[in-house]
Swiss-Prot record:
Disruption phenotype: Constitutive activation of stress-induced jasmonate-dependent responses and increased antifungal resistance to Botrytis cinerea. The quadruple mutant jox1, jox2, jox3 and jox4 exhibit reduced root and shoot growth, delayed flowering, reduced seed production, constitutively elevated jasmonate and jasmonoyl-L-isoleucine levels, and enhanced resistance to the necrotrophic fungal pathogen Botrytis cinerea and the herbivorous caterpillar Mamestra brassicae. No visible phenotype under normal growth conditions, but mutant seedlings have increased tolerance to the cytotoxic compound phenanthrene. 2-oxoglutarate binds at N227, Y229, R311, S313. Fe cation binds at H244, D246, H301. It is an enzyme of class 1 (oxidoreductase). This is Jasmonate-induced oxygenase 2. It comes from Arabidopsis thaliana. Changing F157Y: Increases enzymatic activity 1.2-fold. Pfam families: 2OG-FeII_Oxy, DIOX_N. Changing F346Y: No effect on enzymatic activity. Changing I353A: Reduces enzymatic activity 4-fold.
């Protein structure tokens, strides 16, 4: 049996998912205490630290794809755009989209409402403190391993779908417009995700709605993780978020378009993403890699920090219904192309990152079936 699966069962049996293994320290509080050095828990091993070369923006960037004209009443209507998305999903696992249909004013309002929330006094934010059971609320770590290395970030996690998990009482009530703005923002990103899913299906020669059906039709899951990366006294020693691939289906990121931070691993090189104004960054998650039998790739990425400016980003996750098995689609497997992954529900799959924290691509790769 796979060791990672054993670890997850042990952690769950012990009940350690009900509370954090040690007192939570808010990274924002550390940053605002004018530290001259970095606490040991946030210092990454030398092999994981960003280098000066990797910090600097390069001429290389993830693809930027203009979606204007792609979606019409008659269906998907532009083969050139479709081909660019297909190439990005197979070669990069990441791409930016412009003319995506979400109003720039809504994007700005969403980001600035959350920035205002994180600027609230710590005591006010503690009202929303989370636990590792669901991660819902205000948090500062991933994984429940005692003494584990930590990332230089705080976050807020909330559910948007299914509706029975969407609880406004667990959403911040300040600033006054935040609930209304995030509710509208979530609805718009659910629509955008559904449109992109149609493209992903069609590009594999499948029915437009095949991926959506595999995710549970209208019963999909959607959630939002808002990341706050404070200034860091020694950014060359730390990471805002350790290398990982996203465990869910698809991620749509609203980046901080004033401060670079997201890096994508391409051919063993870390590429610093340069956000295009009012673009979303889309990336393939592990569940779509599994459904496509590894035709589409989830890709390792991380976040670097800096000593001069804070960063705020919003990661929207579009996920399968949590209790249905996800496995390679029958239309994409054959005698010559057997299924690479066994069936597993998303509930089972995401326990790994909730217990172990970010671990590169080790989780999805550990489930590859032996040939």
């Amino acid at each position: 049996m796979n060791k990672n699966k054993i670890d997850v069962k042990i952690e769950t049996k012990k009940g350690s998912m009900d509370e954090w293994p040690e007192p939570i320290v808010r990274v924002q509080s550390l940053a605002e205490s004018n530290l001259s050095s970095l606490p040991d828990r946030y210092i990454k091993p030398a092999s994981l630290r960003p280098t000066t070369t990797e910090d600097a923006p390069t001429a290389t960037n993830i693809p930027i794809i203009d979606l204007e004209g792609l979606f019409s009443e008659e269906g998907l209507s532009d083969d050139v755009i479709m081909a660019r998305i297909s190439e990005a999903c197979r070669g990069w696992g990441f791409f930016q989209v412009v003319n995506h249909g979400v109003k720039p004013e809504l994007m700005d309002a969403a980001r600035e409402n959350w920035r205002e929330f994180f600027h609230m006094p710590v005591n006010a934010k503690e009202t929303y403190s989370n636990s590792p059971r669901t991660y819902e609320g205000y948090g500062s770590r991933l994984g429940v391993e005692k003494g584990a290395s930590l990332d230089w970030s705080d976050y807020y996690f909330l559910h948007l779908l299914p509706h029975h998990l969407k609880d406004f009482n667990k959403w911040p009530s300040f600033p006054p417009t935040i609930r209304e703005v995030i509710d509208e923002y979530g609805e718009e990103l659910v629509k955008l995700s559904g449109r992109i899913m149609r493209v992903l299906s069609t590009n594999l020669g499948l029915k437009e709605d095949k991926f959506q059906e595999a995710f549970g039709g209208e019963n999909i899951g959607a959630c939002l993780r808002v990341n706050y990366y404070p200034k860091c006294p020694r950014p060359e020693l730390a990471l805002g978020l350790s290398p990982h691939s996203d465990p869910g289906g698809m991620t749509i990121l609203l980046p901080d378009d004033q401060v670079f931070g997201l890096q994508v691993r391409k051919d063993d090189t870390w590429i610093t993403v340069k956000p295009h104004p009012h673009a979303f960054i889309v990336n393939i998650g592990d569940q779509i890699q599994i459904l496509s039998n590894s035709t589409y790739k989830s890709v390792e990425h991380r976040v670097i920090v800096n000593s001069d400016k804070e960063r705020v980003s919003l990661a929207f996750f579009y996920n399968p219904k949590s209790d249905i098995p996800i496995q390679p689609l029958q239309e994409l497997v054959s005698t010559h192309n057997p299924p690479l992954y066994p069936p597993m529900t998303f509930d089972q799959y995401r326990l790994f990152i909730r217990t172990q924290g970010p671990q590169g691509k080790s989780h999805v790769e550990s489930h590859i079936s032996p040939r």
